[in-house]
Protein backbone atom coordinates (compact mmCIF):
# COMPACT_ATOMS: atom_id res chain seq x y z
CA UNK A 1 0.00 0.00 0.00
CA UNK A 2 1.39 3.38 -1.05
CA UNK A 3 2.35 5.68 1.82
CA UNK A 4 0.75 9.08 2.23
CA UNK A 5 2.24 12.58 2.63
CA UNK A 6 0.56 15.90 3.41
CA UNK A 7 1.88 19.44 3.07
CA UNK A 8 0.34 22.89 2.93
CA UNK A 9 1.63 26.16 1.51
CA UNK A 10 0.31 29.47 2.76
CA UNK A 11 -0.80 32.03 0.19
CA UNK A 12 -0.25 35.12 2.31
CA UNK A 13 1.66 37.10 -0.31
CA UNK A 14 4.09 36.90 -3.21
CA UNK A 15 6.07 33.67 -3.36
CA UNK A 16 9.84 34.00 -3.15
CA UNK A 17 12.93 31.90 -3.83
CA UNK A 18 12.98 30.64 -0.25
CA UNK A 19 9.47 29.20 -0.73
CA UNK A 20 10.52 27.59 -4.00
CA UNK A 21 13.68 25.93 -2.67
CA UNK A 22 12.36 25.20 0.81
CA UNK A 23 9.09 23.55 -0.20
CA UNK A 24 8.18 23.53 -3.88
CA UNK A 25 11.35 21.99 -5.28
CA UNK A 26 10.98 18.88 -3.11
CA UNK A 27 7.42 18.15 -4.23
CA UNK A 28 8.52 16.26 -7.35
CA UNK A 29 10.49 13.80 -5.25
CA UNK A 30 7.59 13.41 -2.83
CA UNK A 31 5.11 12.60 -5.61
CA UNK A 32 7.28 9.72 -6.80
CA UNK A 33 7.34 8.11 -3.35
CA UNK A 34 4.00 8.97 -1.76
CA UNK A 35 0.34 9.68 -2.36
CA UNK A 36 0.66 13.44 -1.90
CA UNK A 37 -2.06 15.71 -0.53
CA UNK A 38 -1.03 19.30 -1.23
CA UNK A 39 -3.20 22.19 -0.11
CA UNK A 40 -3.19 25.97 -0.30
CA UNK A 41 -3.44 27.00 3.36
CA UNK A 42 -5.80 29.93 2.85
CA UNK A 43 -7.51 29.45 6.24
CA UNK A 44 -4.14 29.98 7.90
CA UNK A 45 -3.63 33.12 5.79
CA UNK A 46 -6.62 34.83 7.44
CA UNK A 47 -5.30 34.47 10.99
CA UNK A 48 -3.73 37.90 10.47
CA UNK A 49 -5.11 41.04 8.85
CA UNK A 50 -5.89 40.44 5.16
CA UNK A 51 -7.62 41.97 2.15
CA UNK A 52 -10.09 39.55 0.46
CA UNK A 53 -9.31 40.53 -3.15
CA UNK A 54 -5.58 40.18 -2.54
CA UNK A 55 -6.07 36.84 -0.77
CA UNK A 56 -8.03 35.51 -3.74
CA UNK A 57 -5.32 36.64 -6.17
CA UNK A 58 -2.57 35.19 -3.96
CA UNK A 59 -4.43 31.85 -3.94
CA UNK A 60 -4.71 31.86 -7.73
CA UNK A 61 -1.07 32.81 -8.29
CA UNK A 62 0.13 30.13 -5.88
CA UNK A 63 -2.00 27.45 -7.56
CA UNK A 64 -0.66 28.48 -10.98
CA UNK A 65 2.90 28.35 -9.66
CA UNK A 66 2.31 24.86 -8.26
CA UNK A 67 0.84 23.76 -11.60
CA UNK A 68 3.85 25.24 -13.40
CA UNK A 69 6.18 22.98 -11.40
CA UNK A 70 5.18 20.13 -13.70
CA UNK A 71 3.80 17.84 -10.99
CA UNK A 72 1.80 14.78 -12.00
CA UNK A 73 -1.74 15.56 -10.90
CA UNK A 74 -2.67 11.93 -11.29
CA UNK A 75 -0.50 11.41 -8.20
CA UNK A 76 -0.83 14.77 -6.45
CA UNK A 77 -4.11 15.94 -4.92
CA UNK A 78 -4.04 19.76 -4.95
CA UNK A 79 -6.87 21.66 -3.28
CA UNK A 80 -7.81 24.77 -1.30
CA UNK A 81 -7.96 24.23 2.46
CA UNK A 82 -11.15 26.32 2.61
CA UNK A 83 -12.90 24.04 0.11
CA UNK A 84 -13.08 21.25 2.70
CA UNK A 85 -15.05 22.10 5.84
CA UNK A 86 -13.60 18.95 7.45
CA UNK A 87 -10.44 20.95 8.25
CA UNK A 88 -12.28 23.45 10.45
CA UNK A 89 -14.59 20.82 11.93
CA UNK A 90 -11.71 18.64 13.10
CA UNK A 91 -9.86 21.82 14.06
CA UNK A 92 -12.63 22.66 16.53
CA UNK A 93 -12.64 19.14 17.99
CA UNK A 94 -8.88 19.35 18.53
CA UNK A 95 -9.24 22.85 20.00
CA UNK A 96 -11.52 21.47 22.73
CA UNK A 97 -8.74 19.06 23.72
CA UNK A 98 -5.97 21.67 23.83
CA UNK A 99 -5.19 24.01 26.70
CA UNK A 100 -4.39 27.70 26.82
CA UNK A 101 -0.97 27.28 28.40
CA UNK A 102 0.48 25.04 25.71
CA UNK A 103 -0.77 27.37 22.96
CA UNK A 104 0.66 30.46 24.65
CA UNK A 105 4.04 28.74 24.92
CA UNK A 106 4.37 28.44 21.15
CA UNK A 107 7.42 30.46 20.05
CA UNK A 108 5.76 31.73 16.87
CA UNK A 109 2.80 33.02 18.87
CA UNK A 110 5.14 34.90 21.21
CA UNK A 111 7.05 36.39 18.27
CA UNK A 112 3.94 37.45 16.34
CA UNK A 113 2.36 38.78 19.52
CA UNK A 114 5.32 41.12 20.01
CA UNK A 115 5.07 42.21 16.37
CA UNK A 116 1.49 43.49 16.77
CA UNK A 117 1.09 47.26 16.47
CA UNK A 118 0.02 49.18 19.55
CA UNK A 119 -3.38 50.87 19.64
CA UNK A 120 -3.82 54.58 20.37
CA UNK A 121 -4.31 53.76 24.08
CA UNK A 122 -1.01 51.79 24.07
CA UNK A 123 -2.73 48.38 24.26
CA UNK A 124 -2.17 45.48 21.86
CA UNK A 125 -4.94 43.62 20.05
CA UNK A 126 -3.91 39.99 19.55
CA UNK A 127 -5.95 38.02 16.98
CA UNK A 128 -7.21 34.75 18.48
CA UNK A 129 -6.29 33.07 15.19
CA UNK A 130 -2.59 33.53 16.02
CA UNK A 131 -3.12 31.50 19.19
CA UNK A 132 -5.19 28.70 17.64
CA UNK A 133 -3.17 28.47 14.40
CA UNK A 134 -1.18 25.36 15.47
CA UNK A 135 -4.36 23.50 16.46
CA UNK A 136 -5.77 23.94 12.95
CA UNK A 137 -2.40 22.77 11.63
CA UNK A 138 -2.72 19.65 13.78
CA UNK A 139 -6.17 19.03 12.27
CA UNK A 140 -4.80 19.57 8.74
CA UNK A 141 -2.32 16.79 9.36
CA UNK A 142 -4.37 14.29 11.36
CA UNK A 143 -7.29 14.55 8.93
CA UNK A 144 -5.27 12.64 6.30
CA UNK A 145 -3.47 10.22 8.64
CA UNK A 146 -0.21 10.66 6.70
CA UNK A 147 2.97 8.66 7.02
CA UNK A 148 5.22 11.69 6.57
CA UNK A 149 4.94 15.46 6.79
CA UNK A 150 7.62 17.68 5.18
CA UNK A 151 8.30 20.56 7.57
CA UNK A 152 10.24 23.76 7.96
CA UNK A 153 12.51 24.26 10.94
CA UNK A 154 10.26 27.06 12.21
CA UNK A 155 7.26 24.69 12.38
CA UNK A 156 8.88 21.98 14.52
CA UNK A 157 7.26 23.14 17.76
CA UNK A 158 3.82 23.15 16.12
CA UNK A 159 4.37 19.61 14.93
CA UNK A 160 5.40 18.48 18.39
CA UNK A 161 2.07 19.90 19.56
CA UNK A 162 0.34 17.88 16.81
CA UNK A 163 1.83 14.69 18.22
CA UNK A 164 0.95 15.69 21.79
CA UNK A 165 -2.68 16.38 20.83
CA UNK A 166 -2.90 13.17 18.80
CA UNK A 167 -1.63 11.06 21.70
CA UNK A 168 -3.94 12.83 24.15
CA UNK A 169 -7.04 12.36 21.98
CA UNK A 170 -6.13 8.78 21.07
CA UNK A 171 -5.76 7.82 24.74
CA UNK A 172 -8.90 9.62 25.95
CA UNK A 173 -11.23 8.48 23.15
CA UNK A 174 -9.57 5.13 22.35
CA UNK A 175 -8.74 6.15 18.79
CA UNK A 176 -6.11 4.52 16.62
CA UNK A 177 -4.26 7.46 15.13
CA UNK A 178 -1.17 7.33 12.97
CA UNK A 179 1.61 9.55 14.30
CA UNK A 180 3.40 10.89 11.22
CA UNK A 181 7.14 11.19 10.76
CA UNK A 182 8.24 14.77 10.21
CA UNK A 183 10.97 15.18 7.60
CA UNK A 184 13.06 18.27 6.96
CA UNK A 185 15.11 19.24 3.91
CA UNK A 186 18.10 20.52 5.84
CA UNK A 187 19.97 21.74 2.74
CA UNK A 188 17.37 24.23 1.56
CA UNK A 189 15.01 24.57 4.51
CA UNK A 190 16.55 27.87 5.55
CA UNK A 191 17.40 29.95 2.51
CA UNK A 192 18.77 33.13 4.01
CA UNK A 193 18.22 36.77 3.11
CA UNK A 194 20.69 38.07 0.54
CA UNK A 195 21.22 41.36 2.40
CA UNK A 196 21.34 39.84 5.88
CA UNK A 197 22.43 36.18 5.66
CA UNK A 198 21.80 35.72 9.38
CA UNK A 199 18.04 36.03 8.78
CA UNK A 200 15.77 33.71 6.85
CA UNK A 201 14.57 35.02 3.47
CA UNK A 202 11.09 36.39 4.14
CA UNK A 203 8.64 38.84 2.61
CA UNK A 204 8.36 40.49 6.05
CA UNK A 205 12.02 41.54 6.09
CA UNK A 206 12.41 45.35 6.12
CA UNK A 207 15.07 45.34 3.37
CA UNK A 208 13.38 43.77 0.36
CA UNK A 209 16.63 43.82 -1.63
CA UNK A 210 17.48 40.57 0.11
CA UNK A 211 14.36 38.76 -1.10
CA UNK A 212 14.05 37.36 -4.63
CA UNK A 213 10.42 36.98 -5.68
CA UNK A 214 9.21 34.49 -8.27
CA UNK A 215 7.76 37.37 -10.31
CA UNK A 216 10.89 39.57 -10.21
CA UNK A 217 12.24 40.81 -13.55
CA UNK A 218 15.64 39.74 -14.88
CA UNK A 219 17.02 43.19 -14.13
CA UNK A 220 15.75 43.12 -10.55
CA UNK A 221 17.24 39.67 -9.96
CA UNK A 222 20.66 40.73 -11.26
CA UNK A 223 20.55 43.87 -9.11
CA UNK A 224 19.59 41.97 -5.94
CA UNK A 225 22.21 39.24 -6.42
CA UNK A 226 24.93 41.80 -7.19
CA UNK A 227 24.13 43.58 -3.93
CA UNK A 228 24.14 40.34 -1.90
CA UNK A 229 26.27 40.51 1.23
CA UNK A 230 29.60 38.66 1.08
CA UNK A 231 32.79 39.46 3.05
CA UNK A 232 36.42 40.52 2.65
CA UNK A 233 37.97 37.01 2.65
CA UNK A 234 37.76 36.67 -1.14
CA UNK A 235 37.50 32.92 -0.66
CA UNK A 236 34.55 30.92 -1.99
CA UNK A 237 33.75 28.08 0.38
CA UNK A 238 31.04 26.65 2.64
CA UNK A 239 31.72 28.30 6.01
CA UNK A 240 28.41 29.16 7.64
CA UNK A 241 29.86 30.69 10.82
CA UNK A 242 32.59 32.85 9.31
CA UNK A 243 31.19 33.42 5.79
CA UNK A 244 27.38 33.23 6.04
CA UNK A 245 26.78 35.37 2.95
CA UNK A 246 28.99 33.36 0.60
CA UNK A 247 27.71 30.10 2.08
CA UNK A 248 24.12 31.19 1.42
CA UNK A 249 24.93 31.97 -2.23
CA UNK A 250 26.54 28.54 -2.64
CA UNK A 251 23.57 26.77 -1.00
CA UNK A 252 21.14 28.54 -3.33
CA UNK A 253 23.24 27.84 -6.42
CA UNK A 254 23.68 24.17 -5.47
CA UNK A 255 19.91 23.75 -5.19
CA UNK A 256 19.16 25.61 -8.43
CA UNK A 257 21.66 23.56 -10.44
CA UNK A 258 19.40 20.53 -9.87
CA UNK A 259 16.76 22.11 -12.11
CA UNK A 260 16.61 20.91 -15.72
CA UNK A 261 16.69 24.48 -17.07
CA UNK A 262 20.17 24.84 -15.53
CA UNK A 263 21.58 21.70 -17.16
CA UNK A 264 24.21 23.56 -19.19
CA UNK A 265 25.29 25.69 -16.24
CA UNK A 266 25.48 22.60 -14.03
CA UNK A 267 27.60 20.85 -16.64
CA UNK A 268 29.98 23.83 -16.75
CA UNK A 269 30.38 24.12 -12.98
CA UNK A 270 30.35 20.42 -12.08
CA UNK A 271 29.46 18.84 -8.75
CA UNK A 272 32.28 20.41 -6.71
CA UNK A 273 31.41 24.10 -6.50
CA UNK A 274 34.26 25.00 -4.15
CA UNK A 275 36.79 23.49 -6.56
CA UNK A 276 35.25 25.26 -9.56
CA UNK A 277 35.33 28.68 -7.86
CA UNK A 278 38.76 28.16 -6.30
CA UNK A 279 40.42 30.84 -8.42
CA UNK A 280 37.33 32.88 -9.20
CA UNK A 281 35.86 36.04 -7.71
CA UNK A 282 32.67 36.75 -5.80
CA UNK A 283 31.44 38.52 -8.93
CA UNK A 284 31.86 35.28 -10.93
CA UNK A 285 29.79 33.44 -8.32
CA UNK A 286 27.11 36.14 -8.35
CA UNK A 287 26.94 36.17 -12.16
CA UNK A 288 26.41 32.40 -12.26
CA UNK A 289 23.84 32.60 -9.48
CA UNK A 290 21.96 35.34 -11.34
CA UNK A 291 21.85 33.15 -14.45
CA UNK A 292 20.62 30.15 -12.47
CA UNK A 293 17.88 32.14 -10.73
CA UNK A 294 16.76 33.80 -13.96
CA UNK A 295 16.59 30.47 -15.80
CA UNK A 296 14.32 28.97 -13.13
CA UNK A 297 12.08 32.00 -12.66
CA UNK A 298 11.67 32.75 -16.37
CA UNK A 299 10.77 29.09 -16.99
CA UNK A 300 8.14 29.26 -14.23
CA UNK A 301 6.72 32.49 -15.67
CA UNK A 302 6.45 30.95 -19.14
CA UNK A 303 4.70 27.83 -17.84
CA UNK A 304 2.34 29.88 -15.66
CA UNK A 305 1.30 31.91 -18.70
CA UNK A 306 0.11 28.69 -20.40
CA UNK A 307 -2.20 27.74 -17.53
CA UNK A 308 -5.87 28.52 -18.12
CA UNK A 309 -8.63 29.11 -15.56
CA UNK A 310 -10.23 25.85 -16.72
CA UNK A 311 -7.03 23.93 -15.90
CA UNK A 312 -6.91 25.48 -12.43
CA UNK A 313 -10.54 24.64 -11.67
CA UNK A 314 -10.23 21.06 -12.93
CA UNK A 315 -7.11 20.28 -10.90
CA UNK A 316 -8.55 21.88 -7.74
CA UNK A 317 -11.89 20.11 -8.14
CA UNK A 318 -10.25 16.71 -8.75
CA UNK A 319 -7.91 17.23 -5.80
CA UNK A 320 -10.75 18.31 -3.53
CA UNK A 321 -12.82 15.24 -4.40
CA UNK A 322 -9.93 12.87 -3.65
CA UNK A 323 -9.06 14.68 -0.43
CA UNK A 324 -12.69 14.69 0.72
CA UNK A 325 -12.88 10.89 0.53
CA UNK A 326 -10.05 10.58 3.04
CA UNK A 327 -11.11 13.55 5.18
CA UNK A 328 -14.71 12.29 5.49
CA UNK A 329 -13.60 8.91 6.81
CA UNK A 330 -11.31 10.45 9.42
CA UNK A 331 -13.90 12.97 10.58
CA UNK A 332 -16.54 10.24 10.94
CA UNK A 333 -14.09 8.30 13.10
CA UNK A 334 -13.58 11.34 15.36
CA UNK A 335 -17.30 12.12 15.54
CA UNK A 336 -18.08 8.57 16.57
CA UNK A 337 -15.34 8.58 19.20
CA UNK A 338 -16.57 11.92 20.60
CA UNK A 339 -20.20 10.70 20.71
CA UNK A 340 -21.44 13.29 18.23
CA UNK A 341 -24.24 13.18 15.57
CA UNK A 342 -27.87 12.13 16.10
CA UNK A 343 -27.60 8.65 14.58
CA UNK A 344 -25.50 7.58 17.58
CA UNK A 345 -27.96 8.66 20.29
CA UNK A 346 -29.47 5.19 20.69
CA UNK A 347 -26.34 3.08 19.99
From Swiss-Prot:
Q: Summarize where ATP binds, as residue positions.
A: 10-12, 18-19, 152-154, 191, 200-204
Q: Where in the cell is it found?
A: Cytoplasm
This enzyme catalyses: tRNA(Trp) + L-tryptophan + ATP = L-tryptophyl-tRNA(Trp) + AMP + diphosphate + H(+)
Whichever gene encodes this chain, its name is trpS
Q: Which GO terms describe its cellular component?
A: cytosol
Task: Spell out the disulfide connections.
Answer: none
GO terms, biological process? tryptophanyl-tRNA aminoacylation
Keywords, comma-separated and alphabetical: Aminoacyl-tRNA synthetase, ATP-binding, Cytoplasm, Ligase, Nucleotide-binding, Protein biosynthesis
PANTHER family (UniProt xref): TRYPTOPHAN--TRNA LIGASE, MITOCHONDRIAL
Which is an annotated Pfam family here?
tRNA-synt_1b
Where's the motif 'HIGH' region?
11-19
Main localization, broad class: cytoplasm
Question: How is the quaternary structure described?
Answer: Homodimer.
| Protein name in UniProt | Tryptophan--tRNA ligase
Entry EC no(s) = 6.1.1.2
Q: Where is this motif: 'KMSKS' region?
A: 200-204
**InterPro entries in alphabetical order:** aa-tRNA-synth_Ic, Rossmann-like_a/b/a_fold, Trp-tRNA-ligase, Trp-tRNA-ligase_bac-type, Trp-tRNA_synthetase
Entry function: Catalyzes the attachment of tryptophan to tRNA(Trp).
Species this protein is from: Mycoplasma genitalium (strain ATCC 33530 / DSM 19775 / NCTC 10195 / G37) (Mycoplasmoides genitalium)
Q: Which NCBIfam families match?
A: trpS
UniProt lists the family membership as follows: Belongs to the class-I aminoacyl-tRNA synthetase family.
Amino acid sequence: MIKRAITGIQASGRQHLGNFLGVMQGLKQLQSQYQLFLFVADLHAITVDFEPTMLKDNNLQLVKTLLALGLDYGKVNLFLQSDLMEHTMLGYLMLTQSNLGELQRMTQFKTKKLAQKRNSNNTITIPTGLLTYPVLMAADILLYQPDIVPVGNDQKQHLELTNDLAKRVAKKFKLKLKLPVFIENKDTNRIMDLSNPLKKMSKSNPDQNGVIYLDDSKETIIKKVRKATTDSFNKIRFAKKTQPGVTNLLVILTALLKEEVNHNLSKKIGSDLVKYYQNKSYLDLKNDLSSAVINVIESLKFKKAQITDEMVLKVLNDGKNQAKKVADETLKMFYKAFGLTSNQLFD
